[in-house]
């Protein structure tokens, strides 16, 4: 059974790239066509790369590895935290602190300090101190919780990282590459595919797209954990969400992708470029 369907990708707007004036030429091979000045990503390739990334994550976790989820842009913060928490993996959805990977020994000391402050607060360790001291300790704890709370249980650098928007998270990607940690990421049309080991061509700006693809990676982690525990294979297919009706041109794209006979690229391109200008518009082109 497919990990995710073409219909789910279309419903979440995964096929919308950036404006044609904002692109990375290295992404040309992942682009199907353009419509109304917006690049349309080839979802057939997206499905293929999702399968590769899914298998890699599943095997990595099954053999004892961990995956760090990274997404600090507003569109990704909620899904990154929710999905990582669901499968017990570390995450960063606030500002990435330089050295989180390359200087992990120092970061680990800060994590120990966070746990120390939490223990003091819970066991009455703040008692007997002045109000000013208590306020200072509380602020320190809250600051550490905000910046490091998602990785509180990360005892060592991860086996791989999942990234939403490699341009925004370029520091995290750079640190992972420096340490030889595999990078799995959504590749929008303005990204550099050379920086990613397991790319998934798609829209990294739409909330639903980022959530769907993050859920796919989390499902791969869950299946890997079950395999590690000897519980057998789980169905990693994400649950379908209520979706808005597809525009006519998107319905044609879905039909051409699911037809028993492979349609010609010319016919598919015509179906897209001839679509009415008032069809479903892409998400805001913001990083």
UniProtKB/Swiss-Prot annotation:
GO molecular function, one term: structural constituent of ribosome
Signal peptide: none
GO CC terms: cytosolic small ribosomal subunit; peptidoglycan-based cell wall; plasma membrane
Keyword Ribonucleoprotein found: yes
Record's compositionally biased regions (Low complexity): 254-277
SUPFAM superfamilies tied to this protein: Ribosomal protein S2
Entry-linked InterPro entries: Ribosomal_uS2 (IPR001865), Ribosomal_uS2_bac/mit/plastid (IPR005706), Ribosomal_uS2_CS (IPR018130), Ribosomal_uS2_flav_dom_sf (IPR023591)
Gene3D superfamilies, per the entry: Glucose-6-phosphate isomerase like protein, domain 1 (3.40.50.10490), Helix hairpin bin (1.10.287.610)
Family: Belongs to the universal ribosomal protein uS2 family.
Biological process according to GO: translation
NCBIfam families to which the protein is assigned, alphabetical: rpsB_bact
Disulphide-bridged cysteine pairs: none
Stretches the record annotates as Disordered: 254-287
Name recorded for this polypeptide: Small ribosomal subunit protein uS2
Record key words, sorted: Ribonucleoprotein, Ribosomal protein
């Amino acid at each position: 059974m497919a990990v995710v369907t073409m219909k789910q990708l279309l419903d979440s707007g995964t096929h919308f790239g950036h404006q044609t004036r904002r692109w990375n030429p290295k992404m040309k091979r992942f682009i199907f066509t353009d419509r109304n000045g917006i690049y349309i990503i080839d979802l057939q390739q997206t499905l293929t790369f999702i399968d590769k990334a899914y298998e890699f994550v599943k095997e990595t976790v099954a053999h004892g590895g961990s995956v760090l989820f990274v997404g600090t842009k507003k569109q990704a913060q909620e899904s990154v935290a929710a999905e990582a928490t669901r499968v017990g993996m570390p995450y960063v959805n606030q500002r990435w602190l330089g050295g989180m990977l390359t200087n992990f020994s120092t970061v680990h000391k800060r994590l120990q300090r966070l746990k120390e402050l939490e223990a003091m607060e819970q066991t009455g360790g703040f008692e007997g101190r002045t109000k000013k001291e208590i306020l200072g300790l509380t602020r320190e704890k809250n600051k550490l919780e905000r910046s490091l709370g998602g990785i509180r249980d990360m005892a060592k650098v991860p086996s791989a990282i999942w990234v939403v928007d490699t341009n925004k998270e370029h520091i995290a990607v750079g640190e992972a590459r420096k340490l030889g940690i595999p990078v799995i990421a959504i590749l929008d049309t303005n990204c550099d595919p050379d920086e990613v080991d397991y790319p998934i061509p798609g829209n990294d700006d739409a909330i639903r797209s980022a959530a769907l693809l993050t859920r796919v990676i989390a499902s791969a982690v869950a299946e890997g954990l079950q395999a590690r525990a000897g519980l057998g294979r789980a169905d990693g297919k994400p649950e379908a969400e209520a979706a808005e009706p597809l525009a006519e041109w998107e319905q044609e794209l879905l039909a051409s992708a699911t037809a028993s006979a492979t349609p010609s690229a010319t016919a598919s391109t015509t179906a897209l470029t001839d679509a009415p200008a008032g069809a479903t518009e892409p998400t805001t082109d913001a990083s």
